[in-house]
Amino acid sequence: MTRIITKNSSTASAIPLAGDLVQGELALNVTDKKLYTKDSGGAVVSVGTPLDENNPTAADTVTLGLWAGRYIGPNNIQNTFIGSGAGASFSAGTGRSHVAVGHDAMALATFGTGHVAVGENALLNISGTNYATAVGTDTGVNCTSGGQSSVFLGMLAGSQVTTGAQNVCIGFNSNPTSATSSYQFTLGHTDITSLRCNVQTITSLSDARDKTEIVDTPYGLDFINTLQPRQFKWATRDGNIKDGKVEQGFIAQELLAAAGDNKADLNLVLEENPNKLEASAGNLVPILVKAIQELTAQVEQLENN
């Protein structure tokens, strides 16, 4: 049976000395009703109530671990911090309804509502945003004023994000185009070479009731003839698994040149990160259909003559 001893103190949040406890013993501070124990490493940790050096009245908050919720203030309510350093910096801030589990999870966070951080350093620096979910070591570790309503799943997922919001990153080291990118969904990192599913296309919104100024596309055969389909061998600057592989496709810079002043309408290249251009060849499908229609008309005209 675990022995419970009492530590009488006139100072709220006074912590028992490690030498006063045997491993596994519980110590109760009768002044502020905080409970402590000594872990296997010889450190004194709080159990069930916040280890609070600023205010003992944070409502409905539970902490477990050395310095978990260490500086929690009176406006930081309904939080759960489990693990050494988890949620340690909530003091003057108004963070509430957070769950941080793991060493230094949300350790430097101060403001916000409803974050879930599971894993060492998960959402370490996040402040001023709400409702981010990060599961895995170092997920969203560099988010500062970003991460709003984002989901990071897998070690280092979203680790490069700083101010970007409403991103979804799934898989090891998966990240958006840039640290400030928002509204992106990223599956895996740059070494992923196959996207497998039981269907071959992604269904997107195309309802006429959600569109206006509908006209026939002005782009067709003439534009298609300006494109340069290429064969190339990958030699990535970051040295990933695709290096040496031969593929067919387009060059982003050549697509931009073909689009000219109409690149915004055609949306063939994502330029958000100028150091890593990304092509959306699928946006050529409507133009290819128009080109086929124009060719069909030419063939029919020749046949009729």
Model regions and ranges:
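Short, polar loop/linker segments at the starts of domains and inter-domain junctions
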Residues: 14-22, 80, 241-248
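Intramolecular chaperone/auto-protease modules of tailspike-like proteins
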Residues: 205-305
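Glycine- and small/polar-enriched repetitive beta-structure motifs of secreted/surface proteins
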Residues: 49-206
